[in-house]
Amino acid sequence: MEKKAVIITGGSSGMGKAMAKKQAELGWHVMVTGRNHEALEETKKEIQTFEGQVACFQMDVRSDSAASDMIKEAVKAFGRLDALINNAAGNFICPAEKLTPNGWKAVIEIVLNGTFFCSQAAARHWIDQKQQGVILNMAATYAWGAGAGVVHSAAAKAGVLSLTRTLAVEWGSKYGIRTNAIAPGPIERTGGAEKLFESEKAMARTMNSVPLGRLGTPEEIAALAAFLLSDEASYINGDCITMDGGQWLNPYPF
């Protein structure tokens, strides 16, 4: 049986790396992409379980041409493409009144534009091949709630959520392409956690906001992602699954 193949953008660290590792353990071919070539190669060495299983592609998701090249390279490496995980992201804490135009544009371009460019490139391939693929996007609970200090990311993630639902309807009905999203809460060993926990006060606030009283792990996100990519989830489309320990039920976003 031919092994399935997935592309994971931002796949060399945090949740992206965990998802890449999980799919590799399940026997999938995996392409990890990002801007740091050395980090990509290191990830490849760590997660590969057989020769030729993992490929690296250095790119910037803000480029639509790079997104197209990414798809071509994955198909060249594996002979097929079955799924795309749009994990590349950019974020930083900044009061809205102090946010610069460049800071705003950078996050919007990476998170929203990048997600669309990569999704479009993958869908064009599947449509041409008359294949039913799967897209998984990374959202955030503040996409429908609120998050002081992350207006740029909140706006971008809200766009990703709307994009997810719209493409699920449009491409799902026309081509059988499934599109879903995951909205993670505070996850340990990620860039987001490092930014949030710059002080003990910030850490305490976050921990108190999660009913389960702990952070999530990249491995838990990876397990959910693996399910959503699997045939067992073939009737899930246009949904956003929250994995935040119940934090969204509390009054504080982080």
From Swiss-Prot:
Any one Gene Ontology BP term:
fatty acid beta-oxidation
Keyword Secreted recorded = no
> Molecular function terms in GO for this entry?
2,4-dienoyl-CoA reductase (NADPH) activity; oxidoreductase activity, acting on the CH-CH group of donors, NAD or NADP as acceptor
Task: Look up the EC number in the record and give it.
Answer: 1.3.1.34
Pathway assigned in UniProt: Lipid metabolism; fatty acid beta-oxidation
Please list the residues that make up the active site. Y142
Tell me the residue numbers annotated for binding NAD(+): K157
Q: Which Pfam families match?
A: adh_short_C2 (PF13561)
Alphabetical UniProt keywords: Fatty acid metabolism, Lipid degradation, Lipid metabolism, NAD, NADP, Oxidoreductase
- The residues the record assigns to binding substrate are T100
Superkingdom of the source species: Bacteria
What induces this protein's gene, according to its Swiss-Prot or TrEMBL record?
Repressed by FadR in the absence of LCFAs (fatty acids of 14-20 carbon atoms). When LCFAs are present in the medium, they are converted to long-chain acyl-CoAs, which antagonize FadR as to its binding to fadR boxes on target DNA and thus derepress transcription.
Q: Where does NADP(+) bind?
A: 6-38
Q: What chemistry does it catalyse, as a reaction equation?
A: a 4,5-saturated-(2E)-enoyl-CoA + NADP(+) = a (2E,4E)-dienoyl-CoA + NADPH + H(+); a (2E,4Z)-dienoyl-CoA + NADPH + H(+) = a 4,5-saturated-(2E)-enoyl-CoA + NADP(+)
NCBIfam families recorded for this chain?
Answer: PRK07677.1 (NF005811)
The role this protein plays is: Auxiliary enzyme of beta-oxidation. It participates in the metabolism of unsaturated fatty enoyl-CoA esters having double bonds in both even- and odd-numbered positions. Catalyzes the NADP-dependent reduction of 2,4-dienoyl-CoA to yield trans-3-enoyl-CoA.
Q: Which family does it belong to?
A: Belongs to the short-chain dehydrogenases/reductases (SDR) family. 2,4-dienoyl-CoA reductase subfamily.
**Name the UniProt record assigns to this protein:** Probable 2,4-dienoyl-CoA reductase [(2E)-enoyl-CoA-producing]
Q: Which gene encodes it?
A: fadH
